[in-house]
A protein has these predicted regions:
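Secondary-structure end/capping motifs
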Residues: 79-158
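Short beta-strand-to-loop elements that line the ligand-binding cleft
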Residues: 8-15
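Short helix-capping segments at alpha-helix termini
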Residues: 2-7, 156
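A generic structural signal for alpha->beta connector loops
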Residues: 6-8, 46-47
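Residue-level "edge-of-site" marker
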Residues: 14, 36, 54, 125, ...
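Hinge/cleft segment of the Venus flytrap/periplasmic-binding protein
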Residues: 160-170
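Pocket-lining segment of extracytoplasmic ligand-binding domains
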Residues: 18-111
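Residue-level marker of alpha-helix boundaries and capping positions
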Residues: 10, 28-29, 138
Length: 170
């Protein structure tokens, strides 16, 4: 917002489950949210999606940049103490990612009942673009690092985090 001259704003932290209801109640004017919340608001006729890819465009300064907004994570102590089990877990997870990539419509059926996404919107919600640890390109890691650096620059993190060191290596 600052990059677009909107300095007179009051950002507030709001639980994601309150984004759409808060707009509907007139308590807030706009919200930056993640999926499926944007689609839920749109389908219910409460909100309109103004723009997608805002992190890439405004924080990473490249509208085509990948943004990794979530992770599948494994505790470091487990990786050290039970590496064989972790490899099995990662292989099973990769198999699931491959299934979603190859069968997106079939995968959508699992959204209802296994997530908070209601059956009425499973066909509307964009599916995640999964990127496995061994698929990251150097440019992906550079954009990932740039995103984390924002938190260091804003004094949210007390020291710089090295993103590359946080990625599982197999």
């Amino acid at each position: 917002l600052e990059k677009n001259g909107l300095g007179d704003i009051q950002p507030i932290e709001l639980p994601v489950g309150q984004h759409v209801p808060s707009i509907a109640a007139g308590q807030i004017d706009a919200v930056y949210t993640l999926e499926p919340t944007g689609t839920i608001g749109k389908v219910k006729g409460i909100t309109r999606i103004l723009e997608t890819g805002v992190i890439s465009k405004y924080v990473l300064d490249d509208a085509e940049a990948p943004w990794f907004g979530g992770t599948a994570s494994v505790v470091s102590t487990l990786i050290k103490s039970r590496p064989a089990d972790v490899k099995k877990y990662v292989a099973a997870y990769a198999k699931g990612v491959d299934f979603v990539r190859k069968n997106p419509e079939e995968s959508r059926k699992s959204l209802d009942g296994f997530t908070a996404i209601d059956e009425s919107i499973v066909k509307e919600v964009p599916l995640a673009n999964f990127v496995m640890y061994n698929e990251f390109k150097p440019s992906d890691i550079a954009f990932f690092q740039k995103f984390f650096d924002v938190f260091t620059d804003r004094k949210i993190f007390t020291k710089k985090l090295d993103v590359k060191s946080l990625i599982y290596t197999g």
